[in-house]
Amino acid sequence: MAPSFDHLPDPEEDEYDEEELDISDLRERFEVQLEQGLDTFVVIDGLPEVNEDTKPKLIKFLLRKLDSVGQTKKDSIHMPIGPDGKSHKFAFVEYSSPVEAIAACKALDGVPLDKKHTLRVNKLTDIDRYGREGRIDENYTPPKIEEFTEKEHLRSWLADPAGRGRDQFVMYKDDRVQVLWNNEKDAPESIVDRQHWTESFVQWSPQGTFLTSMHQQGVQLWGGPSWTRQKRFAHPFVNLVDFSPGEKYLTTWSNRPITIGEEGHPALSIDDDGKNYVIWDIETGLPLRSFANLDLPSNSVDADGNPIKRKIQWPAFKWSSDDKYVARLTQGSSISVYELPKMNLLDKTSIKIDGVMDFDWAPATPHREGVKTYEQLFCYWTPEIGSNPAKVGLMSIPSKEVVRTLNLFSVTDAKLHWQSDASYLCVKVDRHSKSKKSLATSLEIFRVKEKGVPVEVVDSIKDTVINFAWEPKGDRFVIITTAEVVAATAVPPKTSVSFYCPEKVKGNGVGNFKHIRTYDKKNSNAIYWSPKGRFVIVATVHSQQSFDMEFYDMDFEGEKPESDKDLTANLQLMNTADHYGVTDIDWDPTGRFVATSASIWKHTMENGYHLYDFKGEQLREEPVEKFKQWLWRPRPPTLLSKEEQKQIRKNLREYSKVFDQEDADRGASADLAVVEHRRRLLDEWLAWRANMEEDVKADREDAGLPLDPLEPLKSKMASGDEGQAIEIEEIVEEIVEETEEIIS
């Protein structure tokens, strides 16, 4: 039976000592940890000057911004007032936690309060850390000026020490990176060989000045004769890098947003926290601006109905040819153009283009007929929206003038292809039939430099174009078409390769584009033009079934077919080759040599490289274990004027005689060296044999044996009957008849 209330002990009569009770374990478990120190305080600078009467209004206005990142109140804002009754233009603010104080520094620093005042927000502990007594020396100490040391010439490689005008290339295999001279048929000459030089891949800058190495901490640029580090850009976990055409600026991207800890960052600031892209000034090594990823729209969903994220578009920031502008596409709405080096938005606003799908800068400054001021140019395209047709446009920057537009109908997709001199723009338009069951391709070619930018249409193509490539510095192009739907299958679809060029016209004009020839029943999927034009390789890459390469000459010097008399080309297949498992094909910058390679990044079978000349003759083949990359070193644009280049072309035959003689002399000297080496080896062997014979003779004399080892045999043969016949029997079996009997 439970005790009644009357039987319970009276707590007032119960005698005990509170100090004897041990509740330390409960206190340790449940005690609320109060924030210590000044971590919850921030200092706000840049406030307007107020007096005691207007101070409450400013605090009330300020609270609206402060409450957007954390919890604070009117009593937590302390705004000192001076003896003259006016504020000191700063205030102390207390938040409820250090996390909110850090968030306030990130979100409110640099935010405009009004047109004349911009907030500067810092943690109070930072001010104490960097500004307390002893941190700054009161006495001025002049900086120590280091002794001048001359920097290395970053383009010294252009003066080949061998005097042969050789090109360099970088090869990445296993964990080693090598830079080498190309020696054609002979083994390449190593310049530098380093282990663990990069963590993912290497990349040349557009003019070959720098070699880029990728690291978890960021990007490093190397160059000069001694291959020392020239620059470093601290972007943690960087994945990709892109240079401006003139090597003035650099874009780095990481799929991980940047995180700036309390200890800070050597190059980036709190403003860069949470960003993925950083645009750098290469000369100073400083960041110009950072950007976050954009959420790319996607029309496809997974099995659970969630939208599938699209792959990142690279490069996301595209450079103008003169390095003065960089632009970014917000797909479906706008193009943002930024002025360099300040990275301010052009005219402080993005260019609104409804539905815009893609854009691309002209690779050179186009000199358009009838235009006095030459500006940069970019093209863009928009799909059909409602009853509005698809559209291709050309816009001039910085004026933002729309130079030319073209309406298109029944468009499924479009691709933009600039010619290297910006003389032409080809828009490859995939159109669907009314039933939307079949596709066909037309080529809309904008003649950019001609007055009014006329458009020529090549619509005689019945199949779908899967590849298109302009001739560099020329006006001819190659396309690859297929009648089948291209899918990721082991057996590639049958394709056709077609060549086009302008027809001849009087004067300096360029005629209409005409079809030269088509080669059917191919497996080709890639086009590689020589950087100097004229020669082109049509190949099959990334295939498990076919590895063909065909070398074509567009200006063959032989007899021209009658059907091509009115065309500006004489097409000839020079050679064919194959490289098992080929994944990459690279022309050297002079157009003399071609390297084909099979990278372990794609497959592990027969990795290595082949080297060909421009005619398709194989010069060298080298299997390389764990081969990853081969990249020719680019060359900067020539410093010769057009007149000087014309003079060189005029005397090219005379120069060729000198070069041919040098090649012959070098080949003869190489042959002579081989002969001398073999003769030296033979002389060494004959001398060794003579010494050994002397030693054997001495040993036989000491052993009492005849000097000639064959002397006993000769004596025995001499003592026998010379005329005695020797009978030799040989048994030969011959099959006379053969029968076959089946036994059941």
From Swiss-Prot:
Biased composition (Acidic residues): 11-21
WD repeat residue numbers: 193-232, 234-290, 307-348, 577-622
PROSITE patterns given in the database record: RRM (PS50102)
Key words of the record: Cytoplasm, Initiation factor, Protein biosynthesis, Repeat, RNA-binding, WD repeat
Keyword Iron appears in the UniProt entry: no
Coiled-coil annotated residue ranges, if any: none
Chief location: cytoplasm
A GO CC term assigned to this protein in UniProt: cytoplasmic stress granule
Matching CDD domains: RRM_eIF3B
Any GO molecular function: translation initiation factor activity
Known partners and oligomeric status: Component of the eukaryotic translation initiation factor 3 (eIF-3) complex.
Family: Belongs to the eIF-3 subunit B family.
Stated name of the protein: Eukaryotic translation initiation factor 3 subunit B
